[in-house]
Each structure stands twice: as C-alpha cells, then as structure tokens.
C-alpha cells in the first residue's frame, strides 16, 4: 500500500530533520501552504499543493447588523473581539494580560464594546474561574463590560472591528475575513526557552509567516 499525507507536521517551523522520516515512510505529500513545496522538492519527496481546508470550510462573514442584533450591541460603537485561546495553558497565561489591555482601551474609549470568545474545549467551571479571577484584578472593568460568547467564533471574527487573539489557526481565519488583529502568546518559562532554541521562525502567527 501507499501512504498519502495531508496537513503535514510543521517542519518549516521547527525540527526540520523530521523530513527524513517523512521521506522514508510517506509516498506522497499534500501541502497546505505554498512555501512547503520548496522543502519537499529539495528533499525529492513527491508532493501536491492542495491548499488549506479553511478556505472551503469557513462560513460567509456575518453582517455587522445581524451580529449586533444577536448580542444586543450598538453598531455605531466599535467592537473588539478577544480570543484567549482554546487550551488551558493558553488561557491561564493570556486571560489576565488581555483583560488588562481591555481595561486600558476602555479608559481611552468608554464606548468600546468587548466580546470574549469562549472555546468550547474549556469547561465552564474552569473558564469562569480564570475569567473572574483575571477580571477582579482590573479595578475599572466589570462583568458587564465583557460579553462572553460561545459557539459563534466565526461571527465574532467577521463582525468585530478588530480582534486580539492567541496565536493559532484562528489567526488564519481572521486573516481570511480581513479582520485586523493583534496576535499574542504567553506560556510557562521552560517551554518558552525550549521553543526559542528549536524554532526557526522570526515571527508569530500564520498570517505573518505566510507574508514572511
């Protein structure tokens, strides 16, 4: 039998030596990003550029008026989307600095509306504990200032004026919707030191990597 591999490990980001195992065990590679092709071409691995599945899976953008009606927001005021991550490791380290940034933005623009996307992978007791703990440290921010939204990420991504988010696939979705974004990431000290030593990339976030 032959082995066909779609959505390859991100060897272009770290541990390029894994390409030797790919050559040994995989008969044909289907690339999701254009720049992957040069790696497999140089390694003499048969490949086809198939494109990223997100391009065909994303729903049409949600109209701002529809989004505002759905969540009782004022379409005349700016809306900021916040994505603190879909993993506990991300949310643990990003929730507090993100809400701190929101508090500062609200000081500059009291009419700013903030929606925070809760990942369905995070259970309610854990998520709201982290959220409430982070919120309690912001003296000028209340629960009424941040609307939590679940199961509607694509609407948040497409209807907001801008988003701040953890690095991940969601950044590519925001780029496809042409939504301005700030990409951020924070984790424990030890994993950060390890990543610094094995990662080849000078930038963070799939949109930046594609542009680079």
Model-derived segments and spans:
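Nucleotide-activated sugar donor-binding and catalytic core shared by glycosyltransferases
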Residues: 1-212
